[in-house]
């Protein structure tokens, strides 16, 4: 049995969610109305998975999550309304260790429940398999979540602008492709800030997230990274010094234009089950780049999205990195890349950036 704690201040939402999982037959469920009740229930019930609403009376979901991750770490899924404020809070939660997010529908919750049911069940089952490892780094992020880390934003912007101009002096020789899902936002928060502003290759990312959150995620990363970070909400020229985040609920591909190659958001296709699709992103890059000029990184996530395409990328002369099982929240996608024999390197998340920098700089110098 999977022990599930549902924390939401709406009695209707609690009842509806409880009904969904009781029908599955293998869930034992408790509910909480406030963050404080949720903390007490975590201690008493010891759930395998917790769902948290962002907005709750007394103690909000973000504060409750921080306490859970410090005192009794376990998989937490945020269930958030589709507002800009909640999107930012939800991304803060994922930086603190929440493994996934489900967007509440904008209309009547009960009317949308049948559409959401498969996603709800799949997400919670995936979260139940996640491995949460408390670390000093995570504790530090929790304790300093609300402190502004940028002591001199203007100085940082000036340095970043100068480095971008140096990086753009020559056409980008290649492309970094990153795919991730469950646990990905926290992993990207570790990897991307390590890349320098003059990194010579553009970086294209497919992170499985609802559309409401990818724009806010790009803005958050842009504040924390030396590289420019943007959402692919419009066609974007692929340029050095820039990270491109695929828009949620769509796919992101590489496409040609007279001015050069671009990152393009396109409608999701049914033959690719996850979105933004890592597999489709890599397939499109292989149509326009020599395999030797591609670097694939597959990180934490349920399932196998991207593993086959990245194995093909390696066979065509490219290089790939699979996140090690020791740091992946869910070793599904990177594990499948390893099983297919398509991983050039297998590295813990903290070491991936160094390999990306070494390979990118070496190839740029060729």
From Swiss-Prot:
Molecular function as annotated in GO: phosphorelay response regulator activity; protein-glutamate methylesterase activity; protein-glutamine glutaminase activity
Keyword Hydrolase: yes
A Pfam match: Response_reg
PTM note: Phosphorylated by CheA. Phosphorylation of the N-terminal regulatory domain activates the methylesterase activity.
Entry GO CC: cytoplasm
Source species, domain of life: Bacteria
Database matches in PROSITE patterns: CHEB, RESPONSE_REGULATORY
Domain CheB-type methylesterase: 171-363
Feature: compositional bias, Basic residues: 156-166
Reaction catalysis annotation: [protein]-L-glutamate 5-O-methyl ester + H2O = L-glutamyl-[protein] + methanol + H(+); L-glutaminyl-[protein] + H2O = L-glutamyl-[protein] + NH4(+)
Residues of the Response regulatory domain: 3-119
GO biological process, one term: chemotaxis
Enzyme Commission designation: 3.1.1.61, 3.5.1.44
Major subcellular site: cytoplasm
Residue positions, PTM 4-aspartylphosphate: 53
Active site (UniProt): 181, 208, 305
Subcellular location: Cytoplasm
Region Disordered, residue ranges: 149-168
Keywords for this protein: Chemotaxis, Cytoplasm, Hydrolase, Phosphoprotein
Record's function text: Involved in chemotaxis. Part of a chemotaxis signal transduction system that modulates chemotaxis in response to various stimuli. Catalyzes the demethylation of specific methylglutamate residues introduced into the chemoreceptors (methyl-accepting chemotaxis proteins or MCP) by CheR. Also mediates the irreversible deamidation of specific glutamine residues to glutamic acid.
Record-linked NCBIfam families: PRK00742.1
Family statement: Belongs to the CheB family.
HAMAP family, alphabetized: CheB_chemtxs
Domain notes: Contains a C-terminal catalytic domain, and an N-terminal region which modulates catalytic activity.
Name recorded for this polypeptide: Protein-glutamate methylesterase/protein-glutamine glutaminase 2
Organism whose genome encodes this protein: Rhodopseudomonas palustris (strain BisB18)
């Amino acid at each position: 049995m999977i022990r599930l704690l549902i924390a939401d201040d709406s009695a209707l939402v609690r009842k509806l969610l409880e009904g969904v999982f009781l029908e599955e037959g293998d869930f034992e469920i408790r509910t909480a109305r406030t963050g404080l009740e949720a903390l007490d229930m975590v201690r008493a019930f010891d759930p395998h998975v917790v769902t948290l609403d962002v907005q709750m009376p007394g103690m909000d979901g973000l504060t409750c999550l921080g306490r859970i991750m410090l005192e009794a770490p376990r998989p937490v899924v945020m269930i958030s309304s589709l507002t800009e404020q909640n999107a930012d809070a939800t991304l803060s939660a994922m930086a603190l260790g929440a493994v996934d997010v489900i967007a509440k529908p904008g209309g009547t919750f009960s009317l949308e429940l049948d559409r959401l049911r498969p996603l709800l069940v799949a997400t919670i089952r995936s979260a139940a398999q996640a491995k949460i490892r408390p670390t000093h780094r995570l504790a530090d992020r929790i304790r300093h979540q609300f402190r502004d880390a940028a002591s001199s934003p203007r100085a940082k912007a000036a340095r970043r602008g100068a480095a971008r101009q140096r990086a753009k002096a020559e056409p980008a020789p290649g492309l970094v492709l990153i795919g991730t899902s469950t646990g990905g936002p926290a992993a990207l928060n570790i990897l991307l800030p390590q890349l320098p502003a003059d990194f010579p290759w553009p970086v294209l990312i497919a992170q499985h997230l609802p559309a409401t959150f990818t724009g806010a995620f790009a803005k958050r990363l842009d504040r924390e990274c030396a590289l420019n970070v943007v959402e692919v909400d419009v066609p974007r020229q692929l340029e050095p010094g820039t990270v491109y985040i695929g828009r949620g609920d769509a796919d992101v591909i590489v496409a040609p234009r007279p001015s050069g190659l671009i990152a393009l958001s396109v409608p999701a296709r049914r033959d690719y089950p996850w979105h933004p699709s890592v597999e489709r992103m890599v397939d499109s890059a292989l149509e326009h780049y020599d395999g030797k000029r591609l670097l694939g990184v597959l990180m934490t996530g349920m399932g196998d999205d991207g593993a086959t395409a990245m194995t093909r990328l390696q066979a065509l002369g490219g290089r790939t990195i699979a996140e090690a099982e020791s740091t992946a929240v869910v070793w599904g996608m990177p594990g499948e890349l390893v099983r297919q024999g398509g991983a050039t390197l297998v590295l813990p998340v903290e070491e991936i950036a160094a390999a990306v920098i070494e390979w990118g700089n070496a190839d740029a110098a060729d």
